Amino acid sequence: MKNLISIILLILIFFNYSKFVKSKNCKIAVLLSGDFSDLGYNYQFNEARVKAESILKLSDFSLYYKNLDESEELSEASFKDAIAQGANLIVVASSGQTEMGLKYAKLYKDSDIYWIIKTSARPVDYLPKVAVLDFNTDRAHFTLGYFAGKMSKTGVVGFVSPGAYIASNGNAFYLGAKEARSNITFVTTFTGSWFNPEVAYKAAEMLISNGADFLGMSQDDMSVQKAVIDSGSLGLGVTGYPTRLIYGSANIGLSYITDWTDVFVKYASHVINDTWPDSDYYKTSLNPGGSLLFDEYSYLVPQSIRDLVNNEIEILKNDDFNPFRCNPMYIDLGYKLDVNGCISYNEFEKNQQVLKGDKYSKTISFGTYTIPIEFVDYSSSMKLGITITSSICIFLCIISIIIVLVFRTARIIKSASPAFLFLILMGCILIFIGCIIFSQSPNEGTCRARVWLLSIGYTIFLGSLLVKNWRIWLLFDNPKLKKRSITNWKLYPWVAGILAADVLILAFWQGLGNIRSESRIGIDSLTKYQYTNVCSSNDQGSIALYILLVFHGIKLLVACFISFKIKVVDIDEFNESKPIASSVYIITFCLFIVIPLMVSPQSVTSQVTTICVCAIVTTLISIILLFGSKFYKMITQGAALNQTFASSSKSSSFSQSLEKKKTGEEDDSESSEENGKKAIVVTQQSVLAHFSSDTEDDENETQQIDEEKDEQIAGSNEDIIQPEENIEENNVSVIQSKRLSNQLNGEVEIDSNNL
């Protein structure tokens, strides 16, 4: 009795002591290969962390580190940070971090830090605080291979894995498929990483192109299965997450699931209770508590196949049954089979060779897959659109040139100087050709040609427009009626001078700028496996380009000034101020769009599109403004309209009265005595504009002037009476009209003293 009481007291003392002894805190840190949002391998580990924290009501919040496979520096920094923040249960969930995990476990083996490290065998060093997590998915892969073999319509299945060091999973998948279909063909490739979605997807596409309709994988995300689903076949859930919840039962045939919650709770409890099992080893299995199980089938899977697969799963729950290790094909890899016809588990895990197949089935290994670097050109729609639009505009320019040449003697064309109209249209054609070249893929030739064509095209276009209207301004801005002889041949050197300045700047740009085509990656939303060509130059080339822009800007400003000055011209055929001003303003507006694009970082495709569209739109609108009204008047009023050049002022009526006088009609315009105006007698002479070719010689010109003088003498018998206030104004307008008409067409200048 006394002994019984003593035992009870000891038990009570023990439990009371345990209650008062403060338990250890457990702070979990999980190191992941990728992002926990992958709804796959990393998601399952992170979910187990969260659940364990909730179940155990841990006071210290746990930690997680993601994407550690991206760089060794990031991985090492994560280990250091976890230790610095007081984590005492560190879970290394990535095989890629196993070596570094063992390194830090060795460094801190005397510290109160415990480790769960994913690997297949105990480390060589004695590290009692390290629990090995042998994530053995061989049975799961064998089962999925069996399912794929039964479901395959092509008789070809495949496998994508990080590398040859993980060949065991692929061999298990192949042997499962061969168990289901003896003549199966197996194709495989490696990605070089557990987590590289781009490479995994492209590798899967490559296997699918070789006939595979079901693919297994050892990847931490679903990129491989996305490629399978995109090809129209059923994917397999191989990340540990019930992927039918993401892609739907119609797309996922079967998934295996991993649930690590029990593992986290188990080892965290050991840390809290200070009951850590030295050098522990945890291996996954299909048995209850083994962390592996299968999700439900897709409704597209026939019941007969479901029954066969379920049967196989039940057999595989026997840990002594290892069909993935027991096959004569291992002999071809240099292994010896034991009495049961199997290789050892260690040999199976460390094997880095793909099985070679037998007389019934074959295997094809494509080795490590690398994504070929892909050239990304400008979009075909953009190139086609700009090319077609520019070609149509070139056709319109050619038609306009033909019209100008055919109807060059028509008053409306002749008054605008056909030679300069021709130059303007040629400049526009160069601009449109430059736009076509600008939209093509850059190379050394196109990088130079597109700038040359656009710049020279605009120089000829604007230069001709500027010079021909500068002549109009000089002739009409002449209140003292000074004799000014400005023929086309006197204007051509000015156009040539402007063009020479442009060519000089372009030569400097090309000679010193090192203009070239370069291949670039990482621009325009390109992936690291894509590149495009862009035009490039050095600093001297950039300076020359800025000078070129300033040069064109000055031309625009001068053109704006001249278009403003010729607004006062009251003869419609010579007054092109409105279309010129509109053209210049539109070009200037677009220039304020193009310049910022050229000096600021923008999408290359956007730059090209904007520049080409602005060039086409401004040039086309300018053509319509400058030539549309002329052609319309020729169609509606005839080619020889406005024999005396219509004017909105008194000069026009005076010209008409003089013309009537010449044909025998008398002008009764006498000044009235009521106005007290002095009558002035004026000798009438012909003031009609006479047009002739610029190529006529001086003899013909002299003869024409003599004939005009004879007509003036013959008509001098009658006087024209005009009010004094009208005489000076009318004389100015008439003389300017006559002078401009003659000079536009190469005739000899007539002095105002002849009137």
Curated annotation (Swiss-Prot):
Q: Which residues form the signal peptide?
A: 1-23
| Gene Ontology cellular component list | plasma membrane
Ordered alphabetically, the record's keywords are: G-protein coupled receptor, Glycoprotein, Membrane, Receptor, Signal, Transducer, Transmembrane, Transmembrane helix
Pfam families cross-referenced by the UniProt entry: 7tm_3 (PF00003), Bmp (PF02608)
| Record's bilayer topology term | Multi-pass membrane protein
Q: Which residues lie on this side of the membrane: Extracellular?
A: 24-385, 439-455, 514-541, 600-607
- Which residues get glycosylated? 16, 183, 273
Mark the transmembrane ranges: 386-406, 418-438, 456-476, 493-513, 542-562, 579-599, 608-628
- List where in the cell it is found: Membrane
Output one GO MF annotation. Answer: GABA receptor activity
Which residues does the annotated region (Disordered) include? 656-676, 691-729
Q: Which residues lie on this side of the membrane: Cytoplasmic?
A: 407-417, 477-492, 563-578, 629-755
Residue ranges under compositional bias (Acidic residues)? 694-710
Which Gene Ontology terms describe the biological processes this protein takes part in?
A: aggregation involved in sorocarp development; G protein-coupled chemorepellent receptor signaling pathway; G protein-coupled receptor signaling pathway
Q: Which domain of life is it from?
A: Eukaryota
Similarity remark: In the N-terminal section; belongs to the BMP lipoprotein family.
Q: What is this protein called?
A: Metabotropic glutamate receptor-like protein B
